[in-house]
Amino acid sequence: MNRKLIFMLLTFLWLMMGCQSREGHFITDEVYRSQVYADLQERESSLEQGDLFSVFNQPMNMEEKEAMSFLYAYMPLGDIADYGGDYFLENVRTSLLARKEMPWGKNIPEMVFRHFVLPIRVNNENLDESRMVFYKELKERVKGLSLHDAVLEVNHWCHEKVIYTPSDARTSSPLASIKTAYGRCGEESTFTVAALRSVGIPARQVYTPRWAHTDDNHAWVEAWVDGKWYFFGACEPEPVLNLGWFNAPASRGMLMHTKVFGKYNGTEEVMMQTPLYTEINIIDNYGETAKVTVTVKDKEGKVVPDARVEFKVYNYAEFYTVANKKSDEKGQTSLTAGKGDMLVW
């Protein structure tokens, strides 16, 4: 009996250790984790001068190390050079704390959290301490709310802090937007995404490069709620999600897109894959769409692989490029877009 009991205890401890080991990983997919480490090593090899990666010498648990590895593997080079490692480690720890303390944290899929909560950068803004500042201010405000209602409440908070005013092309940081109390749509959406991510809510900035019905462009926010992405106007609170002044224009839009740091393997159509980010097409969230396939041939009728194909929308008295593609070995490329007119060049 004693031997049997000891054997059962050892088996239980072994299983518990295995579970803890899996739970300790920030990236549980071994193949993806290996890819992240390989990409990080490649960056380190190309940036040997200085101590840009010295933060990895600090004590970290497995979860923190893997999260930091993901950030450093795919963040812009300027961020690695301009901001210290302690800054990114503090952001990582705050993000993991939010996932632990917020009631919805345990229900957010690993991939969604990795790509739409962990990253600090939203656009081309200066990075700041907003993740830590916003978390301290917002965690009590969303306490006891569902994920759906928390998104609405955070947007109300954003409206209290920032209102719309046109500005220049330089995107202000989230804390700078609070200090000025205004921002254009790209700044309001950057600010709102930062606020949502601070309390562990997956969020992304959405752009239509050019409207189909009028000149100019627009930016807003999508938040992930219980398995689905919902849109809303940044700093423009409404009583429900999927409602904004731009509902009708967006339903006629030709293209909506967002950029996702890292090698993203979601369900959305990939428009462009770079070493650092994945640009995805999310037009299907807004209206009726159709997929067009283009075949590139030379004057002799032969297919042309690796040809650059531009999809353009007429706006501001010009044909503006909203998507760049490359033809495959068959000379073909495709794009899903709203139903309307485009020039393919």
Model-identified regions with their sequence ranges:
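N-terminal accessory/pre-domain segments preceding catalytic cores
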Residues: 19-151, 198, 225-229, 249-345
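Hydrophobic/aromatic-rich core segments of domains that either
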Residues: 136, 140-141, 145, 150-156, ...
